[in-house]
Amino acid sequence: MSELVLITGITGFVASHSAEALLSQGYRVRGTYRFQEKLDGLLKNRPEWEKKVEFVQVPDCRAPNAYVEAAKGVDYVIHAATEVHSNLEPPRKDPHELLHIAIQGCENALIAAAQEPKVKRFVYISSEAALKGPVNYFGDGHVFTEKDWNPKTLREAEESDDELLNYTVCKKLGERAMHAFVARNTPRFQAIALNPPLILGPVFHLQSVDNLNFSTWFFWQLIKGRYEVAPESKFFNYVDVRDLAEAQVKALTAKTDKDRFVISGGAFKNDDIVNVALKYFPQFKDKIAKPNGETSPCNYEVDASLSIKELGLTYRPAEETFKDATESLYKLAGLL
């Protein structure tokens, strides 16, 4: 019988692609979800998953032993569940609550994995945010690698209502919790963190554009008619969600002793997105923001070479990612 993988948060953007990648490579999948309506929406687009995937409801990832039942009998755990704002417009989630959900959710997933003797590896979906924070605090030209850590602290996050700051500290502390758990408990399994930047690509887990996660919401604003001219870029590196899913699959069995991998498809700016959208979907030129003419707005670099060397990853071109993301969002909005 093929090996069984537990994915937390399977109704989310990242985890739904993770499940698709695992199924395509012959793994059995068990996924946790929080809300029935989100699972129903996912299954409308993937009805075959009703028979292919086991689903376990976990209403609160902070509850004691939240994932213990879900982890019974599994060979691997991918912790992808996260609580983060869908967008930057009201109503927003309490940023202080997000901090504690991130930490406790990760620890509970680790506790469950440690109680299941079959588990070989635990993969945590961290973030580039755990490396650098909401902005580059390390100076112009810094090259971020697996050695870097966001310098912002829990106290700074708790004293701030800045949602992006809180999110970056969430990801840092969630990942720190993973490394600390391993150091403290020396479990049988190996734990690996993946640190992706802004995650883009096609969406298939939703029924409308009303509940997009942050990264796809950001992308949607550039092509839906909100802006006449693209705003200045605030995010400078991306990865295709399908490449991140492949990274998770490879991280389960790769021959590596590393516990952290920077994941990145490369640098981009907002003009790159709108130029691709205009090239492939000229019928929506009145909705797509015009390029703003930025040259090189990013003042840092991200080195993802370890993921290529140790995990054997290849990253697809940005044009493919942006084209497929644009097409899927227009279809989701009923425009194609």
From Swiss-Prot:
Q: Which SUPFAM superfamilies match?
A: NAD(P)-binding Rossmann-fold domains
Q: Which family does it belong to?
A: Belongs to the NAD(P)-dependent epimerase/dehydratase family. Dihydroflavonol-4-reductase subfamily.
EC number(s) of the enzyme? Answer: 1.1.1.-
Share an example GO biological-process annotation for this protein: methylglyoxal catabolic process to lactate
Q: Where is the signal peptide?
A: 1-21
Name the Pfam families on file.
Answer: Epimerase (PF01370)
Q: Name one GO molecular function term.
A: methylglyoxal reductase (NADPH) activity
- InterPro entries per the record? Epimerase_deHydtase, NAD(P)-bd_dom_sf, NAD(P)_dehydrat-like
| Keyword Cell membrane attached | no
Where is NADP(+) bound in this sequence? 38, 167
| Signal in keyword set | yes
Question: Which key words are in the record?
Answer: Oxidoreductase, Phosphoprotein, Signal
Q: Which residues carry this modification: Phosphothreonine?
A: 153
User: What is the protein name given in its UniProt record?
Assistant: Putative uncharacterized oxidoreductase C1773.04
